[in-house]
Amino acid sequence: MTAQKWPALRVESGQATAVKDNVVVEEAIKLYLNDELVTELVATPTNLEELGVGFVVDEALAKDIQSVRSSSGVVAVYARSARKRPWKLQSSGGMGTLSDLPKVSSNITLTPDNVLSVIRETTSELWTRTGAVHCSVLFLEDELLVKRDDIGRHNTIDKVVGFAILNEIDLSRCIIGCTGRQPAGMVYKVANAGVPVIVSKAAPTYNGILTATDTGITLICFARGDRFTVYANPQRIRNLSGEAAIGPLTCASP
């Protein structure tokens, strides 16, 4: 169950009306890797096996996933080899440090129309009902593969990556579209998955931009209507016009 009806009092211009509102449901999820507790997450209780697999890969805990199962608020992931590192919860919802950034290599390119097509898919039915969830989508080049929503923006990334891994999809040919802001921890997740492009409706942070630049990810934010802003690695965007479309990103001195 992702939402429940709840009695509430809606007030407009001082006039009160009794309503039954759709309210999103969340649950505490315990995630185990090779029978060892890794973390506890608060998540929308759907697609939990994808969430577990995606989290393990996106946090660089393991890549060679053997199996996954979920039951009663517990997700158990099994991998042939798992890294053991001192983990620290990040404010972005990620874990670990950003000291060993991966490099993302891909020949994928996209047009402005591709970018806007991606972001148009990030409105979900659950968000329309509750207004309380984030959404991420996964495109294989220009084909929409999957859409996942969750109360946590980081969980939506883990879910679409988990879907790709469980379905043996080449993530180096993929684009992730999402609704959440992009701090370093979010970009780090996508880099560990090997996805070369992030398209977001929301803002980046300074460290998010630095992380995208260093990992080789094309970071596109404020994608709304017919516009967007490219903050890192714009070489993957083709069919651009204007003088600024030529050459690397530069910034005038303040």
Tell me what each language-model feature is:
Residues P234-L249:
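A charged, well-structured terminal subsegment
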Residues M1-L140, V146-K147:
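Intrinsically disordered, low-complexity regions enriched in acidic/Ser/Thr/Pro/Gln residues
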Residues A43, R148-G152, P204:
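Short alpha-helix boundary/capping segments
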Residues A62-D64, I169-L171, E243-A244:
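Short, intrinsically disordered/low-complexity patches at protein termini
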Residues T250-P254:
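Active-site/ligand-binding-proximal alpha/beta "capping" segment
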Residues S124-I169, I175-I176:
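Histidine/lysine/aspartate-rich catalytic loop segments that bind and position anionic ligands
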Residues H154-V230, R236-N239:
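Feature captures the catalytic cores and cofactor-binding loops of soluble hydro-lyases/lyases
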